[in-house]
């Protein structure tokens, strides 16, 4: 065939292929118009954290025996434990305990291996500050319990879509005597 005719045929095929791809993209876009939005309006709506969420670490000063297991299992040797040995009771006395959340990777090893369970993970994830030195929490700041977002009337809590689907399936699968 003539080269000009062949060029027009390939141009026509390319045009048809491009139109098909644009049409498929448009159909995909239109199929998403009826769905609920995935994103949330963050400061006013907060999602409920999962059950084993690893947030800020809570510390109980009275339970700590200053064994420093948390420092040894931490991949970055993060917790700073200051103690002194009391000769009369032959035991370590904890003086200061601090964690720098600007460096912490929230792995949870310190919580997992603590023999007295004085460390626990909370659901608090809002740790942002303007000064990174404010992220260095001492034992007083670590012992503060997080504020529950469930009781705050100014914040609307939103369940994860996977949690709501599981709860819907459980409710639909449960049968009562009258549901035969």
Swiss-Prot record:
InterPro entries: 4Fe4S_Fe-S-bd (IPR017896), 4Fe4S_Fe_S_CS (IPR017900), NADH_quinone_OxRdtase_chainI (IPR010226), NDHI (IPR004497)
Entry membrane topology: Peripheral membrane protein
SUPFAM superfamilies to which the protein is assigned, alphabetical: 4Fe-4S ferredoxins
Keywords recorded for this protein, A-Z: 4Fe-4S, Chloroplast, Iron, Iron-sulfur, Membrane, Metal-binding, NAD, NADP, Plastid, Plastoquinone, Quinone, Repeat, Thylakoid, Translocase
Cofactor note: Binds 2 [4Fe-4S] clusters per subunit.
Highest taxon above the source species: Eukaryota
Subcellular compartments: Plastid, Chloroplast thylakoid membrane
Cofactors (names): [4Fe-4S] cluster
Signal peptide extent: none
Record domain 4Fe-4S ferredoxin-type: where: 55-84, 95-124
GO cellular component terms attached to this protein's record: chloroplast thylakoid membrane
Residues reported to bind [4Fe-4S] cluster 1: 64, 67, 70, 114
Binding annotation for [4Fe-4S] cluster 2: 74, 104, 107, 110
Transmembrane segments: none
Keyword tRNA-binding on entry: no
Catalysed reactions, semicolon-separated: a plastoquinone + NADH + (n+1) H(+)(in) = a plastoquinol + NAD(+) + n H(+)(out); a plastoquinone + NADPH + (n+1) H(+)(in) = a plastoquinol + NADP(+) + n H(+)(out)
Enzyme Commission number(s): 7.1.1.-
rRNA-binding is among the record's keywords: no
Gene3D superfamilies tied to this protein: 3.30.70.3270
Pfam family, one: Fer4_7
Any one GO MF annotation of this record: iron ion binding
Main localisation: plastid
Subunit: NDH is composed of at least 16 different subunits, 5 of which are encoded in the nucleus.
Annotated function: NDH shuttles electrons from NAD(P)H:plastoquinone, via FMN and iron-sulfur (Fe-S) centers, to quinones in the photosynthetic chain and possibly in a chloroplast respiratory chain. The immediate electron acceptor for the enzyme in this species is believed to be plastoquinone. Couples the redox reaction to proton translocation, and thus conserves the redox energy in a proton gradient.
Stated family: Belongs to the complex I 23 kDa subunit family.
Protein known as: NAD(P)H-quinone oxidoreductase subunit I, chloroplastic
Organism the protein comes from: Hordeum vulgare (Barley)
Organism lineage string: Eukaryota, Viridiplantae, Streptophyta, Embryophyta, Tracheophyta
